[in-house]
Amino acid sequence: RVSVTSSINTWNENESLNSRIMVAGGGGGGYYNSDANYGTGGAGGGLTGYNGSGTNGPGTGGTQVSGGYDKSASSFGIGGFGYGGIGTRWTYNASGGSGWYGGGGSYASSGGGGSSYISGHAGCIGVNSSGKSLTSTYSKVADSISYTGYKFTNTQMIDGQGYPWTIVKSSASSGMPSPTSASLITGNTGSGYAKITYLGS
C-alpha cells in the first residue's frame, strides 16, 4: 500500500485499499460437516482465484475486476475489493480468501480463492484513485499500473497451486519459493509472508 491506514488495526479504508501495488491472493476456507463430507478451499490465484470444491454452492474465485460469489446463488457470498465473501449458511460453510478481489463465500461447501495483483504485471488490471477498474478487459501493460504510478518490472506471479501466470495461466506447475528455505513449495499454510531482499550495493 502506498497510502497507509489511519490505524494499525484498520485495513479497509478506501484510499489505502485503492493504493495497493502488490497483493497475494489468499486461499478460501475448507468445510466439513456431520455427514463426513469435506472439501478444501480454492487456492489463492494468479490473475484469477480457484473455485472452492463441493457441490452445494461452493465459492468461485476472485478475478481482476470482481469478487467471487456463492455458486448456488450468485447474489450471495460476494467477495469484494480486498476481502473475501462470507459463508452464506449458518453452518457447514466457508468464507472466501482475500486478495485483489476476494473469493466467494459458500453455502455448504468451501470458499473460493482471491486473485493476486502486481502493478506492472501483464494481465493485471489496476484501479483509479476511486477504486474503479481501469478497464474491464486487459489489453496493454498500462492497464495494470496503479494510479499511484508505482510499478514493478521483471515480475513473476505464481498461484497457490504453483502455476506461473503471465496473461494466462501456465500449463505446468513450477512450485513457488519457500519463504523459509531454498526449496520450492506448493501453497502456504498459516500466515502469509513478505520477503524483501535488498539488491543495492
Model regions: which residues?
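Low-complexity, glycine/proline-biased repetitive segments and flexible coils/loops
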Residues: 1-201
